[in-house]
């Protein structure tokens, strides 16, 4: 009997259907019972309809040890390929938990490494949908070697193309290092966990009892460890978040983010005059200022639940993408501590890597005091902010909303470390320390010898405030470029970004700097 081309074509489609079925209907049903989508269902939700093209669908493992001989897993437990999100190309991999539990082996890793290389060669973001039981133990050191190839690419492509990790199931052991190197980590509440050592091993070694969710769930990594940047209650929601994030990002480090048309003008915002309390010690939510300044509905907060004393995120100003770094006076008076320093520094460096202008809204009392902070290394961590701002060459703007005291004033994009423009509201207090503390030191003798120390202290506090703790002293010495009407803040920032659009700034040649990690 003669075999013609059409029989071979039919055979091809049969094999494709087998690959697309993954681990089979029973395992797909189990995946759905856990409230989880399959690897391919996730891809369909992430990319624009009809744009996904699969790479290396027929790859299989080549291990013949420990019972794997004859057990072939379609695609070796990972789907790789490319597609479009919001009309722009991306590359991706999606681990298939229905095939070998998504465990990573030699060929599985090669598929991921290959698609990462393709993303870098073509200058497009890489998105990893992680759902894996870890290393494939049967393949031994080949699995570990596979992780190494992925970690290497995460590292060398860092700052070259945006890298996004979405944790959609377990991510344990060595597997966690790949997401940690990427730019943003998304997690799903109750179904995704990350940890190096699992609960059972921890209990055996230390006696501590804890659940997987309590050890490494979405809430833990978003609010406590800071290892994750976003969380959602469902996989559908988290993938929509990823699509939204990608809309703010350039394709690679040689491009700028897309500037979209904006009907909102660079107009007065009258509510800004009363947006924050005039009393410098009264708290408020800095998001009120953000919402008044940026394009309506454009602010996407990053690391929302971690280190809440600083707010960072992406937004648009008249259609142009900007990165915002803002003190949060309603938490710890906006003071900087170890975690907020790390949070801000990482975000600043990301924005600089991908040509996103930085805007700082400053209202800071200083670095947070305490033995725990000092012993925890606040000196080193605080220095990261100085380093991040100093090395950044994107347009850098600062608006001092109220307080700017001490070393924190210097660290938060002051003129001395490279700010292009610094604006201050007329109520701003710029000084080594707050008027209360300064008056107690400078005028200590007069206060103590006074017949009415409290009255004298109040007078001296006001005297210090009038003489030093105002924006005009700094403006007279060039440390503030202009004192502005709060209602003009949006106008001034838009004008400044337009002026700085073609900014170019070089740095001395070096292999790389030595950031105080």
Report each predicted region and the residues it spans:
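Ligand-binding clefts of soluble mixed alpha/beta catalytic domains
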Residues: 1-517
């Amino acid at each position: 009997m003669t075999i013609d081309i059409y029989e071979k074509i039919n055979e091809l489609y049969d094999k494709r259907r087998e690959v697309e079925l993954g681990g089979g209907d029973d395992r797909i049903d189990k995946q759905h019972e856990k409230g989880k989508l399959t690897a391919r269902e996730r891809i369909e939700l992430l990319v624009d309809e009809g744009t996904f093209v699969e790479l290396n669908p027929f790859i299989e493992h080549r291990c013949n040890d420990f019972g794997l001989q004859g057990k072939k897993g379609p695609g070796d437990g990972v789907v790789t390929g490319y597609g479009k999100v919001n009309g722009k190309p991306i590359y991706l991999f999606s681990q298939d938990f229905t095939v070998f539990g998504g465990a990573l082996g030699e060929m599985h890793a090669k598929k991921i490494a290959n698609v990462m290389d393709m993303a870098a060669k073509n200058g497009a973001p890489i998105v990893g949908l992680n759902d894996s039981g870890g290393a494939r133990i049967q393949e031994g050191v080949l699995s570990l070697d596979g992780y190494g190839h992925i970690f290497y690419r995460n590292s060398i492509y860092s700052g070259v193309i945006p890298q996004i990790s979405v944790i959609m199931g377990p991510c344990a052991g060595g597997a966690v290092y790949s997401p940690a190197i990427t730019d943003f980590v998304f997690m799903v509440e109750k179904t995704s966990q990350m940890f190096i050592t699992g609960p059972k091993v921890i209990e055996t070694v230390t006696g501590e009892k804890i659940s997987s969710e309590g050890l490494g769930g979405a809430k833990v990594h978003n609010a406590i460890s800071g290892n994750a940047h976003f969380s959602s209650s469902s996989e559908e929601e988290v993938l929509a978040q990823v699509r939204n994030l990608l809309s703010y990002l350039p394709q690679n480090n040689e491009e700028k983010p897309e500037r979209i048309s904006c009907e909102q003008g660079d107009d007065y915002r009258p509510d800004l005059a009363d947006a924050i309390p005039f009393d410098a010690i009264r708290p408020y939510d800095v998001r009120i200022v953000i919402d008044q300044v940026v394009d309506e509905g454009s602010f996407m907060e990053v690391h929302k639940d971690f280190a809440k004393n600083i707010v960072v995120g992406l937004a648009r100003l008249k259609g142009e993408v900007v990165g915002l770094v803002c003190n949060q006076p309603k938490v710890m008076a906006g003071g900087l501590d170890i975690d907020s320093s790390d949070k801000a520094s990482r975000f600043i460096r990301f924005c600089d890597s991908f040509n996103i202008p930085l805007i700082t809204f400053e209202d800071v009392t200083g670095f947070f005091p305490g033995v725990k902070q000092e012993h925890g290394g606040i000196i080193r961590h605080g220095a990261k902010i100085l380093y991040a701002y100093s090395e950044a060459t994107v347009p850098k703007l600062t608006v001092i909303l109220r307080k700017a005291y001490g070393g924190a004033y210097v660290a938060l994009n002051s003129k001395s470390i490279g700010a292009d423009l610094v604006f201050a509201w007329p109520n701003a207090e710029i000084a080594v320390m707050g008027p209360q503390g300064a008056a107690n030191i400078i005028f200590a003798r007069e206060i103590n010898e006074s017949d009415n120390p409290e009255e004298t202290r109040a007078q001296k506090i006001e005297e210090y405030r009038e003489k030093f703790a105002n924006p005009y002293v700094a403006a007279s010495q060039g440390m503030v470029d202009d004192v502005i009407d709060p209602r003009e803040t949006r106008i001034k920032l838009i004008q400044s970004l337009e002026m700085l659009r073609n900014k170019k700034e070089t740095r001395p040649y070096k292999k790389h700097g030595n950031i105080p990690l």
